Amino acid sequence: MQKIISIKDGVTRMPEWRMAEPVNFESCEGEHIAIVGPNGGGKSMFVDIIVGRHPLLMHDPDYDFSPSTKTLVSDNIKYITFRDTYGGDNDRTYFLQQRWNQLEIDENTPIVKDKLEEAYSMAGEDTPERRALQKHIYELFHMEHLLDKYTILLSSGELRKFKLASTLFSEPRVLIMDNPFIGLDADTRDQLKELLKTLAQEHALQIILVLSKSDDIPDFITHVVEVKDMKVMPKMTKEEYLAQRAPIPSRMLSQELEQQIINLPYSDREYKSQEVVKMNKVRIQYGKRIILKDLDWTVNNGERWALSGQNGAGKSTLLSLVCADNPQSYACDIALLGNPRGSGESIWDIKKHIGYVSPELHRSSATFQPFAS
C-alpha cells in the first residue's frame, strides 16, 4: 500500500518544538484520518511536523505524492485552519471588533468571485481542464449565489466554503483542516461533513481533520490518531478508537464542587433595571444588504434567552450590538441596564457588565509562544 506520509522516530531539531516522545506516523492511500485530542495536547505541533515545518534531527519525513507531478511538499499538502475566518492565520493585527468595523463598502471592497479568481490564477496556468475543475467546485459547493457577494458579508459557513474552494484550486494531494466545524450550527456542520465526504470519495485527495472533540468525527474518516500530553498515540481504525473511547461522564462536576458553586456569596448588582437589554426599531445595513430591519427586542431581568438560527441569519450581528462591538450600535435606539447607548459611556463601561466568550475573542487574545519541551 502506498505510504503518502511516513515519519519514523521524528524529533525536531529545535527543542521548543519537540513532542514529549519521538513521533511515528504513517498515512496510506485511501485513509482519511482524524487527529483528536484536548486543546494544548500537541495536535498543532504534530501537524507542523507532518507538513515539514520544523526540520527533524535524524529522519526527515518521507513523502510519496504520486500520481501528483508536483514535487514541493507545500504544493501537495495544504493546511487550512478555521479558528477564525476574519483575518489571516496568526495575524497579530487582528482585533475583536475587526469584522464590524468594515463599514465602507465601495468599488474597492472585494467580492467572492474576484478573490476566488485570484486564488485560481495563483494556483496554476489557465487551462480548459482547470476551468472545468473550477466549475465543478462551484457546483459542488453550491457557490453560484455567493460569487457576487462581498467577502466581509459572508457567514461563518459561507466563509468555510470560500476558503476551502480557494485551497482546492491548487489540487493538493493531502488536505489538512484544523477545527473545520467550530462555530457552525448543526445543519451547516452536517452540510460540511457531506461536502468533505464527497471530496474524499470523488477526488484523489486524502483528508486529515484536526479535532478537539471525538463527537465531531465524520462518517468518512477511516482512522484516528489521538494526541495528548504532547504524545502521538498509535494510529487505529475509527471503529477501534470509538470502541475504546472512555464514556462521557454523566456529571461534569462532583456534587461537592456543585455545592461550592451554589454557596458562592451573592453579589448585589449595581444596576436594578428591569430591562437588561432594550432595542427599538434597530436597523443594520451593509451596502444594499439589510441584516436587521426594524428589530424590537427586550430582555427583562431574570430572563434567559437562546438565539437560534442558520449561519448568516444575523445572530452574531445582534450580539455585536449588545456588546458594543459594532459601531452601528451607537446610531441605534439601544439601552443596556437602563442606560441608552451613546450617552457618553465608553465601550469598556458597557463591557464591564457583560461576560462574553466566542471564537473571535480567543482569536484576538491568542498568544504566540511555543510550548517548552
Which ranges hold each PLM region?
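Conserved ABC ATPase signature
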Residues: 150-154, 158
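Conserved structural motif at the start of ABC-family nucleotide-binding domains
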Residues: 5, 18-22, 277, 290-294
